[in-house]
């Protein structure tokens, strides 16, 4: 059982980190949605231009009103990368297919080369 958990943990870690493991710039598709899953208070301190605020606590109940097509590319960030990873897993379970965990705000800003606004 422990071996199975270790293997599954490794696969999940590789899948999540593999979304953005290029270390360089990422180019979002034109129809992509940039999703900020932080709290409104965190969002007020700075956010990526064009990002849609959808706190993780509201993700499952409100995502369909923000992204109706489950094949739409969704790029997700938070403060540190933990909540964005959780968001990716929740959205996968809901049938969304094209998901990208950008990690924290500064990581996302560097990867996408999008300015941080306040």
Task: Kindly label every feature range from the protein language model.
Residues 13-17:
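Bacterial Sec-type N-terminal signal peptides, specifically the leucine/valine-rich hydrophobic h-region
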Residues 77:
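Short, surface-exposed ligand- or partner-binding patches at beta-edge/loop junctions that are enriched
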Residues 2-8, 19-32, 40-72, 82-118:
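Rhodanese-like catalytic fold shared by cysteine-dependent sulfurtransferases
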Residues 35:
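Active-site flanking residues adjacent to catalytic metal/cofactor-binding acidic residues
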